[in-house]
Amino acid sequence: MVKEQVYKSTIKSRPLLFLEMKKVSILLNKGFKEFEVKEKAISENIFQVNTESRKKEIASSVLARLKILDDYLIREIGHGDIESSKAIVLYSIMKTDRLFFEFMNEVFKEKFVFGETFLTDADFNIFFENKQQQSEKVASWNDYTFYKLKQVYIRILFEAGYLKNQKGNREIERPLLNIDVVEHIRALGDGIYMDILVGE
């Protein structure tokens, strides 16, 4: 089920964060609470970043994504196969970022379903131009914001295993996902997200 969200561009500084999501998933599975994860992020620097503000930012972002997942999916991120774990992280980003979800649903899914080979610069440009026409909020962003969004979308898809490369002709990949994960997400009523991830 898709919940209406406001458009935001904070994803610019929050890529896939797969290893960070995996670390926190394992901690939550061990019984750690959210506040304890935040404390460990600062006192033990579990994300291995330089500044306190970045430690807090990553902890907040990771926990916000994990909050929309159930115990089974959190456990799968920590202990499941890597392709399915990354797909769950991608699912959590789509669930928490409206613009990224719309890009995946309106642009990436179409290419996936019809077996198109590449994700091009034009795909991004057309998508962002359309969103500027549809939303005053998006229209107020500057060119650099769109440049950074494009960069991070590409990086997320590459790190999640859905693109072979980040530069030039970005070839689309089709990861093999655990059928139990696929069916679980569909059973939650989130088939629209799963259709994107499996290309149906």
From Swiss-Prot:
Annotated Pfam families? BrxA
* Disulphide-bonded residues: none
Organism superkingdom: Bacteria
Q: Which UniProt keywords apply?
A: Antiviral defense
Record bears the keyword Secreted: no
**In its UniProt record, which GO terms are filed under biological process?**
defense response to virus
Which family is it part of?
Belongs to the BrxA family.
Known role: BREX systems (bacteriophage exclusion) provide immunity against bacteriophage. Part of a type 1 BREX system. This system allows phage adsorption but prevents phage DNA replication, without degradation of the phage DNA. Methylation of bacterial DNA by PglX probably guides self/non-self discrimination. When the brxA-brxB-brxC-pglX and pglZ-brxL operons are transformed into a susceptible B.subtilis strain (BEST7003) they confer resistance to bacteriophages SPbeta, SP16, Zeta, phi3T and SP02 and partial protection to phages SP01 and SP82G (these include lytic and temperate phage).
This protein's name: BREX protein BrxA
Q: Which organism is it from?
A: Bacillus cereus (strain H3081.97)
